[in-house]
Amino acid sequence: MKTIDMKYLRLLAKEYPTIAKTATEIINLEAIMNLPKGTEHFLSDVHGEYSAFEQVLRNGSGVVKRKIRDIFGAELDDAEINSLSTLIYYPEEKMDLLASETEDLQAWYRTTLFRLIELCQYVASKYTRSKVRKAMPEDFAYILEELLHENYNEDDKKLYYEEILQHIISLGRAEEFISALSLLIQQLVVDHLHIVGDVYDRGPYPDKIMDTLMNYHSLDFQWGNHDILWMGAASGSRVCAANVIRISARYLNLDILEDSYGISLRPLALFADEVYKDDPCTYFQPKNEENINYSNAEITQIARMHKAISIIQFKLEGEIINRRKEFDMDHRLLLQFIDYKKGTIHLKGKEYLLLDSHFPTINPEKPYELTDAERELIGKITAAFKNCRRLQKHVQFLYSKGSMFLTYNGNLLYHGCIPLHEDGTFMEMKLRGEKYAGRSLLEQFEILTREAYVRPTGTKEKKYACDIVWYLWTGAISSLFGKSEMTTFERYFVAEKETHTEEKNPYYKLRNNELICKQILEEFGLDGECGHIINGHTPVKEGKGESPIKANGKMLVIDGGFAKAYHKETNLAGYTLLFNSYGLQLVSHQPFTTKEDAIKNETDILSTRQVIEMEINRKRVRDTDIGAKLSEQAEDLKLLLDAYRNGLLHENR
């Protein structure tokens, strides 16, 4: 045995000092590895739509209701199943309603507790007692453990079991216990959650989604293009902050900044009212997708703010393009293509009339130079993002749980794309003097995204990393954007639709090719035959015949459009994916009404399951990434056991 092995085994022996303890731990590990694989739940592109997100999270994409049918399908009718499901999703709110509607509340408590315990026993059966115990609320842990691991059908245990429940009811703790059981069931039906990007965008409550995720028991996060914009703003990027405000103004969603995060936009409002007071800002009128009741004065002010921050954004983008020639974005230096006297712009060899040619803050000789007032304003805005504690807490969580991509249990997860040439080869990009492509490119993007947040303000490293974060939002070789260019300016200022075109990276055509998908999987160290790519970012237009299952099942696109704006386009309210011990299931969801409707009328999101891949042999924990680590631990312990038995190490009894 090598010296290094003995050194390691001596350390291991401190934790397992006897043959008995070592053998027991090996048996425990083998037992865990033989349990069924836990359920993975994949969500993508939530876009701030908290109500629908919360419902899908609470119902486990329909898993809770399926488990209820498994246990009580022959005993309960559909109405009773819906009622029990709603209770589990929203226990406190549902019990408030039932308390006023139920004649014999004591009997209802008793029946409900029996059912919830039986259901909880069922969903806990694939986990170790230790794992279930850790998931239990502290106040009820002992009682729950007693109830979950007793067989109350046996006569000698039945009285003991019923007495516990009767005491819970008589002591006035039934509602708290029902809530505890419901939340435990929610937690046990999904072992691990993957968010494949874009909590943020135009939806009203990304902050509530972040709060929920921060309290979730087990998850990871693959950053999306909208997430990266907020991360850049929180890192101190002026251009990212300007983009965040512009998008929020465009979709009448400034409340997320002012009310949810406490970022004051008063300096922007005062600036806009002064500089654009005589400007109708016709082409900067916000989109009122939610039909919220705003006064004309409010809309007028928001339109001015919208235009003011947009011009600042275009100037800041020009600064970056000019100082980062390696980004190869000179064609996006649009402010210098404007004829300010004629009110026209030259784009790709053609001249176009500008819809709006009122630019009071632009110096035609130095179009990217901020005025003193603009510089002061964007400084205040950037400081507000950096000093917002709640936003910083959310962004720190994104950094701690997130990444550009993830390999997990043989699958590859990423939000946007892997930049490809037409021939399927990986596109290269030079970063800090070195060329990167494929996996190494995404790894470098991740390193620089982290540097943008942690590097000291004012350093050249910080400035470069922040510029890269902006490039990830808008650049042609960005794995998060996936298009040739972002034509934001043209959409505001040029009527001709031909100028609005954003050509997709060849990846989006090639991802239908099974060989390309296998090539990508192998680039990331995965088995091209067995693995899958889980992708978000682009809404799947099911209404036009598009399928989320591509490349013979190798590519699964799970952005079905949580954002309400996409519902007409997609005919859906989103896709989620489930990966359990039996295989992969894609779940498509119809639009959600409201939480209040779900609680009162027991409506659920109508979901349709599609089995993508069924396992011939049920997957066990040993077949997962965690299983590989446990197997390695077991092998190390077997070496320790041999060392004890061969006399190389002595037991410490």
From Swiss-Prot:
Keywords: Carbohydrate metabolism, Hydrolase, Manganese. Disulfide bonds: none annotated. Pathway: Carbohydrate biosynthesis; gluconeogenesis. GO terms for biological process: gluconeogenesis. Its EC number is 3.1.3.11. It holds the Pfam family FBPase_2. It comes from the Bacteria. It catalyses: beta-D-fructose 1,6-bisphosphate + H2O = beta-D-fructose 6-phosphate + phosphate. InterPro entries: FBPtase_class3, Metallo-depent_PP-like. Its cofactor is Mn(2+). Signal peptide: none annotated. GO terms for molecular function: fructose 1,6-bisphosphate 1-phosphatase activity. It is an enzyme of class 3 (hydrolase). Belongs to the FBPase class 3 family. This is Fructose-1,6-bisphosphatase class 3. The gene is fbp.
